């Protein structure tokens, strides 16, 4: 077998194996060394390829594809520093447990560590962030090489589904010439393999006595695409309030037991006596709720369908590595406990807080008012993708009357890659992106994917000319002299030119009334910039906090 035949067999077999284990989309960043696999993916009849020249943005775009399709997605780049640009998105995928398949092309072994161009040490380069990594052998025509690929892919597949989900990395050295035989596309197969299935049963004997206490809470964080119906069923039968993070996807169910205003209530001084807490999914966004969890004496139970439990903000008394639905289904045989008054107390606080928030939004002109207006525009067909810092916190506080799905990059919580991730989701969903100006600036080049692929998206850009969230931190008061330069960081950018560069329509709003009448479009790429003031935003938010403090004090 000559080199061309060996290369063709290897890369076509590798592409077929990825398909067999569920990969249907690949984001390719062009380069020479990645030629063999790029051609294999492009020639595969059932794999969709996306082309993105920026590796950093491409990797985040792939995360959006994963969130939108609920399937593993691969990214492919050439050798050298191109691969290093994947790092931020890999870190996000590891913490968020997203099945990202990282494929880095490499120089052959004889060109490593000898000063050859575009060659860096790529072996195990993502060790801190991936669940699996392997440096594949060079194509040599040996049947053992193909066996190695198949065996390693089988091992890696366990990290694409179930409780072990997360990123995997294959480093693939290729020797020139780099072009496979495209007349042998018959080697590209579309056979699927049996995927790992995970199901666990549990014993709740250790928590039976705890569950008989009256004052229990269910706290649900980001559930990604996990089923949550049994949480609602259990809550209904056992009269337990659910404190639901906006990323839990529970708020859109509009269930009477779902509490959405808890962040504002705890900020206002809420201090109800709680006997036990069942924490489900990823940690919640709310800083105030996390602070309460850290100091409460309540017995804490964590339920996460992961092999590595996220214990933040404080280790639980007991944890269960099982899906939420399986866990709550296991509790259905437990005796009922009278909790009507406990539940009603939470529901009353929720109702009063919602009334106060709604009244506030009638008169406010700050960023929250714009966010509240945006939420009112959303339908159940919409997906709201939210940037970090202030946007996600305003959504956390204000999202209580919408059927839209809500997503964000809340693994590493970075402000980079948000535009690209949202556009990846836009390939599968009707996406509205809510984002701040600094986060938008970080990832403006991600907009290229909308232009190249005619993706439909509405971007609401909240421009307070800097880092608005820092106004809420002690630095605002203790470092006044240096605050604006080090933390406020105004850029003075005119984003209208950005919209023009990437073929987005553009509208700028400097008053809330005009924005309220703006219509979101289901087709095309559109940017809506809202101009806000950081100091005014801080002042109006503090007024809302004060109003809610009065409610909590009167109620308790």
From Swiss-Prot:
Q: Which InterPro entries match?
A: MenaQ_synth_MenD, MenD_middle, THDP-binding, Thiamin_PyroP_enz_TPP-bd_dom, TPP_enzyme_TPP-bd
Keywords, alphabetical: Magnesium, Manganese, Menaquinone biosynthesis, Metal-binding, Thiamine pyrophosphate, Transferase
Cofactor binding mode and count? Binds 1 thiamine pyrophosphate per subunit.
EC number(s) stated in the UniProt entry for this protein: 2.2.1.9
Subunit text: Homodimer.
Stored PANTHER family: 2-SUCCINYL-5-ENOLPYRUVYL-6-HYDROXY-3-CYCLOHEXENE-1-CARBOXYLATE SYNTHASE (PTHR42916), PROTEIN PHYLLO, CHLOROPLASTIC (PTHR42916:SF1)
Annotated metabolic or biological route of this protein: Quinol/quinone metabolism; 1,4-dihydroxy-2-naphthoate biosynthesis; 1,4-dihydroxy-2-naphthoate from chorismate: step 2/7; Quinol/quinone metabolism; menaquinone biosynthesis
- Signal peptide positions on this chain: none
The name this protein goes by in its record: 2-succinyl-5-enolpyruvyl-6-hydroxy-3-cyclohexene-1-carboxylate synthase
Q: Which cofactor does it need?
A: Mg(2+); Mn(2+); thiamine diphosphate
Give the catalysed reaction(s), semicolon-separated: isochorismate + 2-oxoglutarate + H(+) = 5-enolpyruvoyl-6-hydroxy-2-succinyl-cyclohex-3-ene-1-carboxylate + CO2
The protein's role, per its UniProt record:
Catalyzes the thiamine diphosphate-dependent decarboxylation of 2-oxoglutarate and the subsequent addition of the resulting succinic semialdehyde-thiamine pyrophosphate anion to isochorismate to yield 2-succinyl-5-enolpyruvyl-6-hydroxy-3-cyclohexene-1-carboxylate (SEPHCHC).
Q: Which Pfam families match?
A: TPP_enzyme_C (PF02775), TPP_enzyme_M_2 (PF16582), TPP_enzyme_N (PF02776)
Gene3D superfamilies in alphabetical order = 3.40.50.970, TPP-binding domain
Q: Which SUPFAM superfamilies match?
A: Thiamin diphosphate-binding fold (THDP-binding)
Gene Ontology biological-process entries:
menaquinone biosynthetic process
Molecular-function annotations in GO: 2-succinyl-5-enolpyruvyl-6-hydroxy-3-cyclohexene-1-carboxylic-acid synthase activity; magnesium ion binding; manganese ion binding; thiamine pyrophosphate binding
Task: Indicate the family of this protein.
Answer: Belongs to the TPP enzyme family. MenD subfamily.
């Amino acid at each position: 077998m000559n080199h061309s035949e060996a290369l063709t067999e290897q890369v076509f077999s590798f592409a077929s194996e990825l398909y067999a284990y569920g990969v249907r989309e690949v984001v390719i960043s062009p380069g020479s060394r990645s030629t063999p696999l790029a051609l294999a993916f492009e020639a595969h009849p059932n794999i969709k390829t996306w082309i993105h020249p920026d590796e950093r943005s491409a990797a985040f775009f792939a995360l959006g594809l994963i969130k939108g399709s609920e399937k593993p997605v691969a990214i492919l780049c050439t050798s050298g520093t191109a691969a290093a640009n994947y790092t931020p998105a890999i870190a996000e995928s590891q913490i968020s447990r997203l099945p990202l398949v990282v494929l880095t092309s490499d120089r052959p072994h004889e060109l490593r560590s000898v000063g050859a161009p575009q060659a860096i040490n790529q072996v195990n380069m993502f060790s801190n962030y991936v669940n699996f990594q392997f440096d594949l052998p060079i194509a040599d025509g040996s049947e053992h090489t193909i066996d190695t690929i198949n065996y390693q892919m089988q091992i890696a597949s366990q990290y694409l589904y179930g409780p072990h989900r997360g990123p995997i990395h294959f480093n693939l050295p290729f020797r020139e010439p780099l072009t496979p035989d495209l007349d042998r596309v018959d080697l590209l197969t579309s056979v699927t393999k049996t995927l790992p299935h995970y199901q666990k049963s549990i014993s709740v004997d250790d928590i039976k006595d705890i569950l008989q206490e009256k004052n229990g809470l269910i706290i649900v964080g980001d559930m990604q695409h996990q089923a949550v119906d049994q949480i609602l069923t259990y809550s209904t039968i056992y009269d337990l309030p659910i404190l639901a993070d906006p990323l839990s996807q529970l708020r859109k169910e509009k269930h009477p037991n779902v509490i959405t205003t808890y962040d504002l209530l705890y900020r206002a001084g809420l201090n109800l006596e709680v006997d036990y807490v069942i924490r489900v999914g990823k940690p919640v966004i709310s800083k105030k709720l996390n602070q309460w969890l850290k100091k409460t004496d309540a017995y804490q139970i964590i339920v996460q369908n992961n092999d590595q439990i996220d214990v933040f903000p404080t280790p639980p008394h007991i944890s269960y590595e099982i899906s939420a639905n399986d866990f709550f289904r296991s509790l259905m045989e437990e005796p009922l406990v009278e909790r009507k008054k406990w539940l009603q107390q939470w529901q009353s606080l929720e109702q009063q807080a919602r009334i106060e928030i709604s009244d506030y939004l009638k008169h406010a002109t700050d960023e929250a008012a714009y966010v509240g207006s945006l939420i009112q525009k959303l339908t159940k067909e919409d997906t709201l993708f939210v940037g970090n810092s202030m946007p996600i916190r305003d959504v956390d506080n204000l999202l209580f009357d919408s059927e839209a799905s809500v997503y964000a990059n809340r693994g590493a919580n970075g402000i980079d890659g948000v535009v690209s991730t949202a556009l990846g989701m836009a390939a599968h969903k009707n996406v509205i992106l809510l984002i701040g100006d600094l986060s938008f600036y970080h990832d403006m080049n991600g907009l290229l994917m909308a232009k190249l692929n005619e993706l439909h998206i509405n971007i609401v850009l909240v421009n307070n000319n800097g880092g608005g969230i820092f106004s809420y931190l002690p630095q605002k008061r203790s470092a006044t002299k240096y605050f604006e330069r080090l933390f406020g960081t105004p850029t003075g950018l005119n984003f209208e030119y950005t919209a023009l560069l990437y073929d987005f329509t553009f509208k700028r709003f400097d008053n809330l009334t005009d924005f309220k009448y703006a219509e979101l479009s289901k087709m095309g790429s559109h940017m809506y910039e809202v101009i806000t003031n950081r100091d005014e935003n801080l002042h109006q938010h503090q007024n809302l906090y004060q109003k809610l403090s009065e409610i909590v004090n009167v109620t308790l």
